[in-house]
């Protein structure tokens, strides 16, 4: 069996693949990204939808004041959706002008404007209209109304059609200001961004040879920009796997994004930031639970907007998620500080992030490690010496790690 190698501490340039745990997590992040081809397609679809709802004869002709991305699309934190490896949700806001006939009428107008749009299906939700594309992409378009002079500060409809038990109402919203706040707190970390984007584009078969951030050509934009956002994507992936079989509401992405923004500290390693974000949300939940309250997370730029207005609904809901996050952080800390078997790490990661994506990521890690050994660039050590695998368990021809016999305990901070 192969021990997870430790990092040789020296003056080598900091990069996301230098530490073995960071390297595996970086490969995981690459495998849950919106691929470059779909990223470009998402931008095209965004523009196409805008043109369609403003077309001559549309109920919204001349009424769309602005059209902008929100959520993960606005902060470059898109990942595959719950229970999938190749479906992606993207979010857009359409700010609507004109007579205010109520929240249900606002959704009615947007639904009518999107009638016959050429996608697999168009579905009306409680707060948005969702377009489902044949390739697995989902586009949520949320109508909003401006309620204050401040840019894009307003409200969105909450209207479940035909349901009297949940009256239609407007909900405060300023996702635009939140996105600006988040991006200001998570600046591009150049070395990290270039290393991961190069790997992402190469995996997609697209050349990426930028010398620095300023030289990145328009056709190869920096999809990955900061350690904070990559850790956020891994937190979201972890949540998606934890709730893959659940049918109810799950911890909202915008809540996790808000906590990530508060926890942001440029310059941290990926594993450290992932642990920091997991603990940040878990402890916020724990603090609320100790007071006998449900977690409340306001928009830092528009406090009347509550990112937790629909989740959690109970103490059980929030404490269950807190336990999931503590388990994740405990396991990562064990991997960073303990003598962890790589086979144990792989098995544990599958439980946290999903089988297929972990298998692909570990294979990529093995291949990268093999290339480094062959080119004498390997920087991992055990007890201070150069770590060179003696058996094919890490870099052998099969490149995947064989499972080991079950044990009563693992080194990952949990009982089997």
UniProtKB/Swiss-Prot annotation:
GO terms for molecular function: ATP binding; GTP binding; metal ion binding; nucleotidyltransferase activity. Residues 150-167 have a biased composition (Basic and acidic residues). It holds the Pfam family SMODS. Its EC number is 2.7.7.85. It comes from the Bacteria. The active site is at residues 89, 91, 140. GTP binds at residues 72, 91, 236, 253, 305-306, 309. It catalyses: UTP + GTP = 3',3'-cGMP-UMP + 2 diphosphate; GTP + ATP = 3',3'-cGAMP + 2 diphosphate; 2 ATP = 3',3'-c-di-AMP + 2 diphosphate. Its cofactor is Mg(2+). The keyword Translocase does not apply. Keywords: Antiviral defense, ATP-binding, GTP-binding, Magnesium, Metal-binding, Nucleotide metabolism, Nucleotide-binding, Nucleotidyltransferase, Transferase. Cyclic nucleotide synthase (second messenger synthase) of a CBASS antivirus system. CBASS (cyclic oligonucleotide-based antiphage signaling system) provides immunity against bacteriophage. The CD-NTase protein synthesizes cyclic nucleotides in response to infection; these serve as specific second messenger signals. The signals activate a diverse range of effectors, leading to bacterial cell death and thus abortive phage infection. A type II-short CBASS system. Cyclic dinucleotide synthase that catalyzes the synthesis of predominantly 3'3'-cGMP-UMP, followed by 3'3'-cGAMP and c-di-AMP in a reaction mixture of ATP, CTP, GTP and UTP. The cyclic nucleotide products are second messengers that activate the CBASS Cap5 effector nuclease, leading to DNA degradation and probably cell death. Cyclic nucleotides do not activate the effector equally; reactions with ATP/GTP, ATP/UTP and ATP alone activate Cap5, whereas reaction with GTP/UTP (the major in vitro product) do not. This is Cyclic dinucleotide synthase CdnG. The lineage of its organism: Bacteria, Pseudomonadati, Pseudomonadota, Alphaproteobacteria, Hyphomicrobiales. Binds at least 1 Mg(2+) ion per subunit. The gene is cdnG. The record marks 70 as: Important for nucleotide discrimination. The keyword NAD does not apply. InterPro entries: NT_2-5OAS_ClassI-CCAase. Mg(2+) binds at residue 91. Residues 145-167 are annotated as: Disordered. Belongs to the CD-NTase family. G10 subfamily. GO terms for biological process: defense response to virus; nucleotide metabolic process.
């Amino acid at each position: 069996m192969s021990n997870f190698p430790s990092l040789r501490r020296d003056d080598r340039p900091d990069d996301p693949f230098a530490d073995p745990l960071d390297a595996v997590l970086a490969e995981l992040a690459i495998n849950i990204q919106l691929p470059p081809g779909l990223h470009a397609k998402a931008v095209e679809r965004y523009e196409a939808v805008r043109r369609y709802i403003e077309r001559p004869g549309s109920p919204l002709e001349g009424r769309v004041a602005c059209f902008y991305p929100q959520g993960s699309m606005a902060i470059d934190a898109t990942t595959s959706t719950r229970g999938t490896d190749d479906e992606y949700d993207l979010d857009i806001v359409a700010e609507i002008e004109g007579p205010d006939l109520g929240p249900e009428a606002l959704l009615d107008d947007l639904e009518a404007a999107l009638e016959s749009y050429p996608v697999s299906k168009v579905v009306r939700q409680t707060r948005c209209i969702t377009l489902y594309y044949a390739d697995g992409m989902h586009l949520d378009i949320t109508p909003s109304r401006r309620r204050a002079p401040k840019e894009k500060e307003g409200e969105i409809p909450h209207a479940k059609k035909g349901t009297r038990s949940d009256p239609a109402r407007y909900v405060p919203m300023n996702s635009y200001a939140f996105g600006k706040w988040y991006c200001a707190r998570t600046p591009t970390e150049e070395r990290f961004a270039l290393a991961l984007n190069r790997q992402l584009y190469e995996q997609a078969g697209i050349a990426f040879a930028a010398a620095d951030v300023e030289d990145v050509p328009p056709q190869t934009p920096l999809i990955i920009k900061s350690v904070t956002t990559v850790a956020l994507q891994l937190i979201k992936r972890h949540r998606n796997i934890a709730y893959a079989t659940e049918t109810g509401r799950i911890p909202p992405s915008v809540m996790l994004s808000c906590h990530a923004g508060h926890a942001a500290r440029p310059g941290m390693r990926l594993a450290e930031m992932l642990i920091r974000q997991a603990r940040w949300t878990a402890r916020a939940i724990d603090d609320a639970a100790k007071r006998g309250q449900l977690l409340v997370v306001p928009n830092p730029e528009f406090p009347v907007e509550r990112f937790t207005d629909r989740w959690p609904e109970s103490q059980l809901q929030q404490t269950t998620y807190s336990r999931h996050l503590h388990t994740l952080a405990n396991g990562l800390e064990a991997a960073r500080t303990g003598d962890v078997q790589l086979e144990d790490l792989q098995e544990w990661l599958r439980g946290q992030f999903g089988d297929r994506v972990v298998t692909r990521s570990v294979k990529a890690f093995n291949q990268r490690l093999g290339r480094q050994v062959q080119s004498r660039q390997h920087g991992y050590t055990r007890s201070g010496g150069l770590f060179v695998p003696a058996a094919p368990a890490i870099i052998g021809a099969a490149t995947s790690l064989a499972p080991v016999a079950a044990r009563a305990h693992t080194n990952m901070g949990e009982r089997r």
